[in-house]
């Protein structure tokens, strides 16, 4: 998990990395589903949006994702938003407030990383 200090990073929580340090992912990647990569995606990065994290390659997403704490429309068109937090944003806010970071990239030490205990997918 990472949560950054800079203007971009302090407004999101990243997860889904099996290594816990921002370098892990699945063996396969998926096509980035956003407009700058030729795919229409009308979901805006508003508070509570869940989106795929990726490296510089637009088709490099695998298991990592991020939750947007504050509206971040500058991400629209370049990251694949795919859902929204429907309850529990107060927990996202608490994590952003209380979890200490160790560097300007927002890295959180393993012993301080929150654990997602339950996710429910709804239509």
Residue ranges and their predicted role:
Residues 1-9:
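Single conserved hydrophobic/aromatic residue that forms the stacking wall/gate
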Residues 39-123:
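Cyclophilin-type peptidyl-prolyl cis-trans isomerase
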Residues 1, 25-26, 99:
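Generic detector of bulky aromatic hydrophobic side chains
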Residues 11-43:
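Glycine-rich, pocket-lining loop/helix-strand segments that form or immediately flank
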């Amino acid at each position: 998990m990472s949560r950054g200090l800079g203007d971009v990073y302090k407004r999101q929580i990243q997860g889904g990395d099996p290594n816990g340090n921002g370098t892990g992912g699945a063996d396969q990647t998926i096509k980035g589903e956003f407009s700058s990569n030729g795919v229409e995606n009308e979901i805006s990065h508003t508070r509570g949006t869940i989106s795929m994290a990726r490296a510089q390659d637009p088709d490099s997403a695998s298991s990592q994702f991020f939750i947007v704490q504050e509206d971040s429309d500058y991400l629209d068109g370049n990251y694949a938003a795919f859902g929204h937090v429907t309850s529990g944003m107060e927990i996202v806010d608490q994590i952003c407030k209380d979890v200490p970071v160790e560097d300007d990239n927002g890295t959180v030490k393993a012993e301080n990383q929150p654990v997602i205990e339950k996710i429910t997918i709804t239509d």
